[in-house]
């Protein structure tokens, strides 16, 4: 058994996925909007939303991160007030009529996060898409800054293993994950005490600092903490023959 994990307590997903029933969004956001036009169907959808809001931590902690115009950066409770409404269920419906908001919902807890982080079968990941959650730009820096250096949950050696070779071995990524002759040369040079995760839920794409020199497929992509403009990344496919 294997798993991967990012080091944040909030999930990130579309409002339609988080706060409407699966049957209502079957076929995508356009199909959902068509169903909402029918009063009987709309009433059925709204009847299921309160429990979904509760399961995501409540309107006061559901954070709108992207794709919602002036509502970006607000909680669902704040957006409800801005819309002149009192019920967050009605706010969900109003927002989904014209937008496709993306949410951060705080559904995890630190104890569980740390418990799984210690497991040898759990690897590092971001699970991130651009501009919606700090995990995309901050996961590895957050692991080093908080869980290696501050809280001592992981040793630096364990962090490196779960972020490199273990991933390459699990996914059969030939020539990756290890520094050795004939490999692709993906190398990150840093001092752990300098690494900072700068991304936040309000500013999810603030880049980490402290990864002073980064080599991607043999080309220098970051030098002295500055991007060089190199475009040396490539699609990585499963391979079983080691390079």
Language-model features: locations:
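Active-site neighborhoods of metal-dependent hydrolases
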Residues: 1-152
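Divalent metal-coordination and catalytic microenvironments
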Residues: 4, 84, 127, 159, ...
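Hydrophobic alpha-helix feature that most strongly marks membrane-spanning transmembrane helices
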Residues: 81, 97, 121, 145-152, ...
